[in-house]
From Swiss-Prot:
Name of the protein described by the UniProt record: Exodeoxyribonuclease 7 large subunit
Role: Bidirectionally degrades single-stranded DNA into large acid-insoluble oligonucleotides, which are then degraded further into small acid-soluble oligonucleotides.
Lineage: Bacteria, Bacillati, Bacillota, Clostridia, Thermoanaerobacterales
GO biological process terms held by the UniProt record: DNA catabolic process
HAMAP family associated with the record: Exonuc_7_L (MF_00378)
Domain of life: Bacteria
Enzyme class, UniProt record, top EC level: hydrolase
Family of this protein: Belongs to the XseA family.
């Protein structure tokens, strides 16, 4: 009996039904290493392999969106799903419904691979880090809206500086949708003009739980942000890709608030010191200007007509006084000379002998008669005494023998 010839689609359909109805193949867990990874609009396509065999796999978007980490070539994973036939090319493949990392090692592998890639691109370069503003007015906190993280940040911020405005941007911080929500928050914030700094925060957790902060898309959103970003993910010992890309890494969310929010007491102290310094500078400048003003005032006064007139008046007064003193000195000197000469003249005067009892005889012409030969009898003469004069007539003239 000759076998009936089946068409390709018939045998393929038969094999597919056998696989779909197989109780084992309908729900399998397969462990292997990812290779030939490709992201497509319809889902994620990759090959799962070990040392001997390989298995094509596909994870459609309805399941792919539930992934809480990014797949990487070389990553060891455990894929859960069903084995079926892809009729178009007649190959069987694993239709994945969930993917788990095969231990922490797989996630560390993906972490280090992405870290190396981004580092080569320069996303971690220190010279590209933006400075964190010293006195921010408004801080955006991208984190879960509930839990200890946001409470601690708000409490510390209000304690340090109640004037700083805190804007909470709620996002998922774990799970497959977390990375997209974080990136969307960054896009929204970067359209605003009132945000001074962004804090990206979440509490501690396992590597799987904090994996969204190791996603490449999150790293690139942080790097592209024009607003400075502080990464505060997990505990002090936790490091994420976000920490390396951010402008500043804080060891904890609470530490981020301590770093970003300025202490108002320090600000008040700085303000007091600045006020004191300003007052000192103003006082010094005022004194300098006052001295300058006094100098200009004096110069103006010295060059004014009134001052010049006053100076000339003082000069005239000084010259007058000097001339008076000089004339007085000359007068005194001449008077003394006159008195001395008068005394000398007086001592030599013929009239001086009258005080000693002598007399002076004058003729009619008031000439002194010094000899009897100058007179004759009956001449009229005048006799001068110290206290008066007398007239007489000569009775007799006789010469000495």
């Amino acid at each position: 009996m000759q076998l009936k010839a089946l068409e390709v689609r018939e045998i393929t359909d038969y094999i597919k039904k056998m696989m779909d109805n197989d109780i084992i193949l309908r729900n399998v867990r397969v462990k292997g290493e990812i290779s030939n990874l490709k992201y497509h609009s319809t889902g994620i396509y990759f090959t799962l392999k070990d040392e001997i065999a390989s298995l094509k796999c596909v994870m459609f978007n309805e399941y792919g969106k539930l992934l809480n980490f990014t797949l990487q070539d070389g990553m060891s994973v455990i894929v859960t799903g069903r084995i079926s036939v892809y009729e178009r090319n007649g190959t069987y493949q694993l239709y994945a419904q969930s993917i788990q990392s095969d231990g922490i090692g797989a996630l560390y592998f993906a972490f280090n691979k992405l870290k190396e890639k981004l580092q080569k691109e320069g996303l971690f370069d220190s010279d590209k880090k933006k400075p964190i503003p010293k006195h921010p007015k408004k801080i955006a906190v991208v984190t879960s809206p509930t839990g200890a993280v946001i409470r601690d940040i708000i409490t510390i911020s209000r304690r340090r500086n109640p004037t700083v405005d805190i804007l909470v941007v709620p996002v998922l911080v774990q799970g497959s949708s977390a990375a997209d929500e974080i990136c969307n928050a960054f896009r929204i914030l970067n359209k605003r003009e009132d945000i001074d700094v962004i804090i990206l925060a979440r509490g501690g957790g396992s590597l799987e739980e904090i994996w969204p902060f190791n996603e490449e898309k999150v790293a690139r959103c942080i790097y592209a942000s024009r607003i400075p970003v502080v990464s505060a993910v997990g505990h002090e010992t936790d490091f994420t890709i976000s920490d390396f890309v951010a402008d500043l890494r804080a060891p904890t969310p609470s530490a981020a608030a301590e770093i970003v929010v300025p202490d108002i007491k320090v600000y008040q102290r700085e303000l007091f010191l600045l006020k004191t310094k300003l007052l000192t500078l103003m006082t010094a400048e005022l004194n300098r200007k006052k001295k300058e003003f006094e100098g200009l005032k004096r110069a103006l006064y010295l060059n004014s007509p009134t001052k010049k007139s006053e100076i000339l008046r003082h000069k005239v007064e000084n010259l007058t006084a000097s001339l008076y003193n000089e004339m007085l000195s000359i007068y005194q000197h001449k008077r003394n000379d006159f008195l001395i000469l008068a005394e000398k003249l007086n001592s030599l005067s013929p009239l001086k002998v009258l005080t000693r009892g002598y007399t002076i005889v004058l003729d009619k012409q008031e000439k002194v008669i010094s000899s009897v030969r100058d007179i004759k009898p009956y001449d009229e003469i005048k006799i001068l005494f110290k206290d008066g004069k007398a007239k007489a007539i000569v009775q007799e003239v006789k010469e000495n023998e």
